[in-house]
Amino acid sequence: MFTESKITEIYCMADDFCKEFSFQQEKYMIEDKKTGHRNKPNRMSDAEIMVILILFHSGGFRCFKHYYKEYVCKHLEHLFPHRVSYNRFVELEKEVLLPLTIFIKKVLLGTCTGISFVDSTPLHVCRNQRILIHKTFEGLAERGKCSMGWFFGFKLHLIINDKGEILNFMFTPGNVDDREPLKQGKFLKNIKGKLCADKGYIGQALFENLFLNGIQLVTKVKNNMRNSLMSIADRILLRKRALIETVNDELKNIAQIEHSRHRSFSNFIANSLSAIAAYCFFEKKPAIEVNFINDRQLTIF
């Protein structure tokens, strides 16, 4: 649970960003001179809506309606004096999807340190028994398979550094190969050095393409593959790949990035983005201690 000082800090960051975002957005908008628009501002600002969405994932809440009515409206009324009804708040969620996405991408993501970890985690939208009658994500969610078996929903692809900070993320349907996001340059923007992954990312063409872009893909070897030499440092880093599994666990258990009660796709995106934003504000993140010793010894390849 965030303290009031932390909530104020998050609000100041979100409010400063929303003001700059609105200023830049108005410069490129085309004015509609045929019809008149009232342009009446909402009672709650975009920053307040973003903060309330983020706070939901910091306190272990599981029902957003109960959280908004029983916690925000009763215990945080001094921080949010211009509250709206729950139904109106759900409608306003859609309006902050774009600024919330850019806020995460431009402000909250970490910095690459040269050691990164990549992995994907499934986001179930319903039980497997209900796949054929599921209508909310019809045409969007797909069947996929992970280490835990078959599922129906989406995949969250994450890249983190050795400090547990999220460097980039991407949502795809459940049937997309884990290697597909790595083939897109935007997903690997500002990523350099070693990129540790599991056996699902093995691919000679992918390894060569990443190596030409300054990224060394480090994976284990499958049983039916010819063994290859690997440095001790790479072997140690592969043992620490559980770091990104811990990040996925915190997103699903401390935050609530995965549940099967979504009523629309926009609600799913708002919940997922706010969970990632809440994780970025966690003071304690899973991390590994990496120390480099300069022994002035040359390595012969």
Where are these regions (language model features)?
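Short alpha-helical elements
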Residues: 1-301
